[in-house]
Amino acid sequence: AWVNKERDVILEEMKRYEDEPANKVEEIYHSLLYPHTKLGMRIIGEEASLRCVGANELRNYHTQWYAPERMVIMLAGAIGSQSNNITEQVTEWFGALPKKKTRNIDVVTPSQTKPQLAVVTKRDAAQAHLIIGLRAYQRDSEDRFAWGLFNLIMGVSFTSRLFKEIREKRGLCYHVRSGSSAYHDVGSWDIYAGVATDKVEEATKAIIGELVRAKAGGITEDELTVARKRLKTMLAFRSEDPEFWTEWYGRTELFGMPLMTLADYIKKIDAVSVPAINALITKYFKTESLNMSLVWSKPRDEKLLTLLSL
């Protein structure tokens, strides 16, 4: 009974996602990047499969993936002299869990030889939502340090290139931002914008234009200095919160990466140079790696695909 009750709740949640184009455009972008893989599937699932899932399937899934050897328990904050008691308590709660053999994760091997475009037509969409991106680095790549700074330069703040060009200069949108998604063996760097339906072509040209400018001219020493200072400031503020540390060390341990202190991370950031970032731009900015997803009220427009060129 509880499975059916929760199923109805999730079906309503699924409808909410369908009504939010900003979420939908991310879904179709990932399916475009990673077709025919679990990474490219919707996290919430599909209605048909959700209606078929029963208690036995859920139990089997839990058995396959939830095991002590996959578990990381991270504590941070004012623990002090209580650490021994906490360790004992955690052992009491979780130490007796039976060990079991779990499945290995699937390896994703991307294959793309030309730009791709995915479009969903939503007749009642008041705005067009688009993502333009490129394939990039996996989660543990050393490229992540330099690229994090480049991302700040391109699309994270009011002083970023994309904000100044797309919003301030051209007035094409209220919100534009860039960001990375890095997984075990694949990753991407993406730009999102919400624009008027009749401005999609202009916005696409403007975004591609900024990518072309970055590829041709790279970044400047001044931009790197500002980005580095901004990143350090962000880390200083965030590190005051114990939740930051639970995520910092917890995710690192969970993903099997070498533990890195904040001081170690800052050393990596300080070591990033303009030539290093420009080399990564050359490495990742390739026409055949471009992908675009779009949710708007119109049918698919093939002209947009022709604009995807670096």
Protein language model regions, located:
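M16/MPP (pitrilysin/insulinase) zinc-metallopeptidase core fold and M16-derived inactive scaffolds
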Residues: 153-172, 183
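Charge-rich, well-structured scaffold segments of protease-associated domains
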Residues: 1-102, 109, 119-120, 137-138, ...
